[in-house]
Amino acid sequence: MHPEPGLWKWDRLNTYLDFIERNEITSRIHGPVGPQSSKWAKNDSRTGQELLENMTEYMTELSKKLNDINVVKWMDVVNETITTTGQWHGEREGDDKWENPWKQIGMNEDGVPIYICKAFELADENAKNVKLIFNQHGGMEVAMWNKVKETVLYLLEKGYRVDGLGWQGHLKDDKKLSLDKNSLEYLSVLIDWAHQNGLEFHVTEIDYVINEDPPTTNSF
């Protein structure tokens, strides 16, 4: 929607918002700060200041727009901020890869990416009517979720509003979460942890990928 300075593309979102409002469809909006970024943002010549200014403009205007739509109840503020090994997701060379350019904005004095704190600050300031979600990908990788939990608790301790924790349920036949007792138990513990800390828990996406070719009965 705001791929580069001075350029806005609201048409698709406006059409979607008009539809859900007209039909009174309770909705959540997935428009977070994260890897889903423009080639301008991923360009290797970008400076942290340029990225901060563009992100600030984007999150401010998006939050204002969503705040005025009564059927929008939740918004993902940041997405895929931490790798499955528990590291901060950052930039990569080129502009055609899965990367998170916003980490280049810098780290604060506590070693937390500035963009994460700034995104929640802006969303809270401009979308008081919408619940704010910290969204994450991956499976049940312990190192990743430990870092996620640590970051969410840090944000709450510093006074940022975080209303929920989201997990993208991208299931695969070679990572059998549904058939793995330990993974299911960990998911249950993760949901309990969210609730114990006053957070909603959302499965923000759900799909099942079959990589086996041809697929066997076991994959199905």
Q: Predicted segments — roles?
A:
Residues 17, 38-64, 130-220:
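Non-catalytic scaffold segments within catalytic domains of secreted glycoside hydrolases
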Residues 1-140, 199, 210-214:
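Substrate-binding cleft and catalytic face of glycoside hydrolase catalytic domains
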